[in-house]
């Protein structure tokens, strides 16, 4: 356990204490020997990387590289984390021993440290079962959304998913869901973090995962949950007869992750011919050998093999899941022969329009609209707001991340409301509220049905997107980031924005663009509110300022919770009838250039631009 601040221990003494404790506790021969080797070599630099600071447990759980030490994902840190989580749950739920928890995992592995998602999941299960708590442990890999689905379906106290989603291959993660089926939000992260610090010494049975196989407390939910998930999914199939007859062909890639068999099953549930799978990428492979980054959000580079297969099989649509299948990218072949990869905001517009249109056909009574909702995050396109204003349902924005949308959706559902859809620009979609998180499996098959239906009207996805913008107003978006590894520099950049025109004066313009409103969710300031106080929750630990411009533009600058990035998201919203998207794009590009030049000031702060 790290020496507490003010304990009088210097940096070297603290490092010595951490490594000594590690040698005493670690029973994984690979990580134990790695630390012994570093000590023998006197490799202080590497030891500091491994032991400098314990991984911080946040609302997204843990995410870090696999390897030895307290700053990495490994057997010992998984045991310590789970012991803390277990003790925290015992305090929160008096019926934990009756209800239990669910654990699943993706296909990640790190042979040099002996770490893998499956191994970590079994160690986590061992921790809970040793305390008399039932564990529903999937016997094989699943998509991340199967964990929140299982929590809700079986009415469990919590869920754990071992995954690093679309991160580089060396990483892994530990994602946590609460009994409401949504990701945890504060203050649970702080409570769990404190409980981890109080339970660092491994419990007697912590390392012996063979004990769980004969335990009556171990349950395998795979078959029943698989069946229940696809039965629930069928309720979102609106055009079964169209699906049976469609001539539209699809290609699917799971990018070496878990999605392949689940998307095949989803297509069968909708009576669609299953998509052609990219053979080099369909099976799980923790090395992700065919891609630089296993992230379909990176666009065409990840989709090269998909496009080649689609060209060969004459498929018009490519569907791409990230490795844990909670996100989805869609690309469509244009008449020119070029491939168009839809942005997260564009697919959000298409899916939102589709789910509302399909719901409206089944609900002719307009009075139901007053209890109908869609959600998106504050940095995502406001296209759903435009559709809601015209059609009469409710739109709400939340803070960034599905933890906020999932928790808000659950509140609304508990109040008897209907939540049709939620999305975020980072290609995350909740099309079916039986999963209170983003779900790339349901999004893939619903996108396929949408494309099949449009084909009966001789429309492509691109043509329908244009029709949505013509009817509800063009929403042109642009997002990017700068890399900055120095937290003090990031803080200074944002503080300077808060005192741009003298102390405590935010900027009144950005270049030639006049600013009409400012919301600062770090300080809680919002000059659009009568009392100047922001309505959305605020957080002093992360930077986030939104500027609204007189020309209808909105831009948000924020820090990333998981990467050394300052991100920006800009959007220009035009009223219906403005059908000159090229002019809007030009104006948005000018606005973004002004923001980069005047607000980011990359030369002054030594920021690295996003690599092309």
Curated annotation (Swiss-Prot):
Free-text remark on how the cofactor is bound = Binds 1 Mg(2+) ion per subunit.
**Assigned EC number:** 5.4.2.7, 5.4.2.2
The UniProt keyword set, sorted, is: Acetylation, Carbohydrate metabolism, Cytoplasm, Glucose metabolism, Isomerase, Magnesium, Metal-binding, Phosphoprotein
- Modification sites for N-acetylalanine: 2
| GO MF annotation terms | magnesium ion binding; phosphoglucomutase activity; phosphopentomutase activity
Q: What is its main location?
A: cytoplasm
Which sites are catalytic?
A: 165
Query: Sorted alphabetically, which Pfam families does this protein's record hold?
Result: PGM_PMM_I (PF02878), PGM_PMM_II (PF02879), PGM_PMM_III (PF02880)
Q: Which reaction does it catalyse?
A: alpha-D-ribose 1-phosphate = D-ribose 5-phosphate; 2-deoxy-alpha-D-ribose 1-phosphate = 2-deoxy-D-ribose 5-phosphate; alpha-D-glucose 1-phosphate = alpha-D-glucose 6-phosphate; O-phospho-L-seryl-[protein] + alpha-D-glucose 1-phosphate = alpha-D-glucose 1,6-bisphosphate + L-seryl-[protein]
Q: Which SUPFAM superfamilies does its entry note?
A: Phosphoglucomutase, C-terminal domain (SSF55957), Phosphoglucomutase, first 3 domains (SSF53738)
Residues that, per the record, bind Mg(2+): 165, 322, 324, 326
Q: Where in the cell is it found?
A: Cytoplasm, Cytosol
**Positions with a binding annotation for alpha-D-glucose 1,6-bisphosphate:** 63, 165, 326-327, 400, 424, 438
Q: Which residues carry this modification: Phosphoserine?
A: 165
Q: List the disulfide bonds.
A: none
Q: Which top EC class applies here?
A: isomerase
Could you name the Gene Ontology cellular component terms for this entry?
cytosol; nucleus
Q: Which GO BP terms sit in this record?
A: glucose metabolic process; purine ribonucleoside salvage
As cofactor, the record names: Mg(2+)
Q: Does the keyword section mention Transport?
A: no
InterPro entries according to UniProt:
A-D-PHexomutase_a/b/a-I, A-D-PHexomutase_a/b/a-I/II/III, A-D-PHexomutase_a/b/a-II, A-D-PHexomutase_a/b/a-III, A-D-PHexomutase_C_sf, A-D-PHexomutase_CS, Alpha-D-phosphohexomutase_SF
What's the stated role of this polypeptide? Catalyzes the conversion of the nucleoside breakdown products ribose-1-phosphate and deoxyribose-1-phosphate to the corresponding 5-phosphopentoses. Catalyzes the reversible isomerization of alpha-D-glucose 1-phosphate to alpha-D-glucose 6-phosphate but with a lower catalytic efficiency. The mechanism proceeds via the intermediate compound alpha-D-glucose 1,6-bisphosphate. In vitro, also has a low glucose 1,6-bisphosphate synthase activity which is most probably not physiologically relevant.
Which family is it part of? Answer: Belongs to the phosphohexose mutase family.
Family matches, as PANTHER family: PHOSPHOMANNOMUTASE 45A (PTHR45745), PHOSPHOPENTOMUTASE (PTHR45745:SF3)
Quaternary state and interactors: Monomer.
Protein name (Swiss-Prot/TrEMBL)? Phosphopentomutase
Q: Where does this protein come from, organism-wise?
A: Pongo abelii
Encoding gene, per UniProt annotation = PGM2
